[in-house]
Amino acid sequence: MTIINNNKLKVIIFDFDGTLIDSNNIKANAFVKLYSHYGKEISRKVLNYHNQNLGKSRNSKFEMFERTFLNKPFNNKIGNDLSNKFSNLILDKLLDAPLINGTEKFLEKYSKDLKLFIASATPENEVKLIVKRKKLNHYFQGVFGSPKQKGDIVEKILKIYKFKLCEF
């Protein structure tokens, strides 16, 4: 059974969380845990915002939580501190998280004929580590993450590899 008609298709650019790895609940729980000491109402707002903005970087979420939900100042140091705490909560769990059902079979089949990439809002160093530990790195031409924006990553891939929009 053919999943994709790849007569014109030359490239696939994947998101990471919830697309290749079953990680959305791990991250949702970590956001709630980080903000639980502010009470149930803030935790509920944090969870709702996270679930409605899955493709946004954690730093942009932290800025929203701090400025809007808590009425607190936000700067790079605060963002980095929160991001480090968040990483400490999730990294081991992400390394143990299962792949989305069918991921490896799909990658095995299509990596032979197509160029595969990851463009994620997760920090690039974390995505690369997880992909390597799960022994998936040989399927991908490139693995990219934040602080770069997904749109910028896609533009870079198109430009460097000279792909046309109709080819992905």
Regions inferred by a protein language model and the residue ranges of each:
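Short beta->alpha linker loops
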Residues: I26, S57, P98, G102, ...
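Active-site neighborhood of HAD-like aspartate-dependent phosphohydrolases
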Residues: T2-N48
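Substrate-recognition "cap/lid" segment bordering the active-site pocket of phosphatases
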Residues: D96, F117, E124-F168
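Metal-dependent phosphoesterase signature
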Residues: E66-E104
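Short, acidic loop-to-helix structural element flanking the phosphoryl-transfer center
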Residues: K8, N88-I118, E124, K128
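Helix-loop "lid/cap" segments that line or gate small-molecule binding pockets
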Residues: V32-S36, S57-F74, I130, I157
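N-terminal polybasic phosphate/anion-binding patch
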Residues: K40, R44-K56, E63, R67
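Short helix-capping segments at alpha-helix termini
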Residues: H37-I42, L70-N75, K135-Y139, Y161-F163
